[in-house]
């Protein structure tokens, strides 16, 4: 598989099946390869965290194909906060949104009262979220302390057959992972 290929209909269908069955996928994002799964499946999220050697307390990002997929998080927020988030999407900006009704499980949110959310404009990320019908967990594809994978061979080197499916595609044009902005305070973390 070459990084420049796009996933076929069959590859997307298999990725969908993997995610819905509780598996873990690797896929290209705007800047680096990501690991993803069903955010409502605790075992799948915990497995990703185990692979990465990442503590649950840190939380992970949710990526979505559209604002509608994360509307449940936006609706309880004031109009001004919603507008600020919408100003950044779709695109390579991750917004920290208050999870005021605690709708996102603690294994995704971590120790935080906010949830990191990105409505992506990357075609593979969007296709995966559309195929599964939900936002997905997204975290960089690397063990803690190592550089994120920027090629399929690095994904395989880091995790071998411990990932259920690798979805082919090209990285987006960004050199760095997405910016992270607290949408209420405006503070930028990355």
Curated annotation (Swiss-Prot):
It comes from the Bacteria. It is found in: Cytoplasm. Signal peptide: none annotated. PROSITE patterns: YRDC. It is an enzyme of class 2 (transferase). Keywords: ATP-binding, Cytoplasm, Nucleotide-binding, Nucleotidyltransferase, Transferase, tRNA processing. Coiled coil: none annotated. Gene3D superfamilies: DHBP synthase. HAMAP family: TsaC (MF_01852). Belongs to the SUA5 family. TsaC subfamily. This is Threonylcarbamoyl-AMP synthase. The lineage of its organism: Bacteria, Pseudomonadati, Pseudomonadota, Gammaproteobacteria, Pseudomonadales. The gene is tsaC.
């Amino acid at each position: 598989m070459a990084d420049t290929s796009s996933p076929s209909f069959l590859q997307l269908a298999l990725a969908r099946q993997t995610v819905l069955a509780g598996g873990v996928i690797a896929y290209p994002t705007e800047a680096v390869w990501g690991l993803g799964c069903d955010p409502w499946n605790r075992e799948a999220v915990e497995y990703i965290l185990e692979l990465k050697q990442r503590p649950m307390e840190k939380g992970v990002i949710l990526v979505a194909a559209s604002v509608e997929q994360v509307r449940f998080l936006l609706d309880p927020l004031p109009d001004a906060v919603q507008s600020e988030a919408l100003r950044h999407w779709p695109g390579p900006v991750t917004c920290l949104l208050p999870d005021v009704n605690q709708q996102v499980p603690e294994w995704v949110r971590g120790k935080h009262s906010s949830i990191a959310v990105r409505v992506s404009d990357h075609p593979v990320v969007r296709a995966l979220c559309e195929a599964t019908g939900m936002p997905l967990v997204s975290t960089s594809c690397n063990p803690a302390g190592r550089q994120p994978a920027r090629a399929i061979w690095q994904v395989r080197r880091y995790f071998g057959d411990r990932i259920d499916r690798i979805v082919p595609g090209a990285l987006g044009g960004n050199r760095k992972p997405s910016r992270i902005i607290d949408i209420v305070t405006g503070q930028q973390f990355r």
